[in-house]
C-alpha cells in the first residue's frame, strides 16, 4: 500500500476511533503532503513514497525545532504535544541510520571518490545522501563529512 494511502487510512481510523490527537496530526501531515504536491506540480499523479517520506522528515524536523524553542523558553506544556506528534509521524519514516553507520558510509564514499579536501564536501555529501536516502539526517551527514575531510 502506498504511504500516502496508509496515512489517509490511519487518519480515518483514528478519527472514527475517537483518537482526535492522532487524527488531527495525520490530517496536518496530509495537508503538508498536499502543499508539496501543489508546489511541485504533482497534484494529478501524486508524490512517490520517497517524496512523502521527505515531507514527513521535514515535518518532524519542524517539530523538533519547536520542542527545542519551547523548552528554552520554559513552555513544557507546549513541548509535550509536539513530542507526541514526533512519535506519531516517526512511524512513517524509514529506520534512521546511526551516527556510526553514517561515519562508515562517509569514510567509504571519501575513499571511493578520492576526496581529500573540504572543496570536495558537496560531492561527498551528494554521494552519501543518494545512497542513504531518507534514512539519514542531512545535517548530520554534512557535519560528519566536514569532520572527516578536515582531518
Place the predicted regions along the sequence by residue.
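Charged, compositionally biased, marginally structured helical/coil segments
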Residues: 1-151
Amino acid at each position: 500500500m502506498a504511504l500516502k494511502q496508509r496515512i489517509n487510512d490511519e487518519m480515518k481510523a483514528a478519527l472514527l476511533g475517537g483518537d482526535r490527537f492522532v487524527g488531527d496530526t495525520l490530517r496536518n501531515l496530509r495537508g503538508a503532503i498536499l502543499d508539496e504536491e501543489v508546489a511541485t506540480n504533482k497534484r494529478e499523479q501524486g508524490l512517490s513514497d520517497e517524496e512523502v517520506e521527505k515531507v514527513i522528515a521535514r515535518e518532524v524536523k519542524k517539530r523538533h525545532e519547536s520542542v527545542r524553542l519551547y523548552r528554552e523558553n520554559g513552555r513544557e506544556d507546549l513541548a509535550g504535544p509536539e513530542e507526541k506528534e514526533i512519535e506519531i509521524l516517526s512511524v512513517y519514516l524509514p529506520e534512521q541510520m546511526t551516527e556510526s553507520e553514517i561515519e562508515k558510509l562517509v569514510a567509504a564514499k571519501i575513499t571511493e571518490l578520492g576526496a581529500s579536501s573540504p572543496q570536495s564536501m558537496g560531492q561527498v555529501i551528494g554521494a552519501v545522501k543518494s545512497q542513504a536516502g531518507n534514512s539519514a539526517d542531512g545535517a548530520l551527514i554534512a557535519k560528519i563529512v566536514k569532520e572527516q575531510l578536515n582531518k
